[in-house]
Amino acid sequence: MFTINAEVRKEQGKGASRRLRAANKFPAIIYGGAAAPVAIELDHDKVWNMQDKAEFYSEVLTVVVDGKEEKVKVQAVQRHAFKPKLTHIDFVRA
């Protein structure tokens, strides 16, 4: 079971996303179900080490957003074209 700590994004847009990536974080979103979508930011290195395992893409993950747990599955992952970097992840509520 994977547990990911996240923070709610305070800023959105291209400039804010670039600042996140420069700070070794990256944007993500949680959507689906009855609740509203939540834009979050994740620590790149922690998630990078988790995504090396195949179970990351098939199991239900726990994302802790401001102390509240969300059960999610990975819907889509975007990677940098040639650097070993994640640029965005979509999570869907399980």
From Swiss-Prot:
Gene3D superfamilies: Ribosomal Protein L25, Chain P. It holds the Pfam family Ribosomal_L25p. Keywords: Ribonucleoprotein, Ribosomal protein, RNA-binding, rRNA-binding. Coiled coil: none annotated. InterPro entries: Rbsml_bL25/Gln-tRNA_synth_N, Ribosomal_bL25/Gln-tRNA_synth, Ribosomal_bL25_short, Ribosomal_L25_dom, Ribosomal_uL5_bac-type. GO terms for molecular function: 5S rRNA binding; structural constituent of ribosome. HAMAP family: Ribosomal_bL25. Belongs to the bacterial ribosomal protein bL25 family. NCBIfam families: PRK05943.1. This is one of the proteins that binds to the 5S RNA in the ribosome where it forms part of the central protuberance. This is Large ribosomal subunit protein bL25.
